[in-house]
């Protein structure tokens, strides 16, 4: 078998036949892309990158750099944690990854406040991004609590 056969859609789907035979029904969270907290963080990241590229590409400021460096982390850490899984042996790693994302979300909020204080961001843009960043941070915190509860109860 050549490596390019792995690119064949039919080859990939052959491994999925067992699911149909057993009556397997996928849950809505079989993929990280379907996880609401990830969707929220991912869209915020995309919009933030667009903001940075359109308004701050030629500016060199510590708060802009902190924002740019931190804003990509929450979605990435949620995805990384999801990839570790939800089994009891791995959920601790999932939680740790998400906590790193939570710390980065807090750094995003701090950077946004600094950008507003320095008049780099106008009030309307600040309110939009700060409220969305806070929503990401809060939802990620709730998600971590849910993961901890799952671990505490021994629910895989």
What are these regions, as identified by a protein language model?
Residues 1-156:
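Amphipathic alpha-helical assembly/interaction segments
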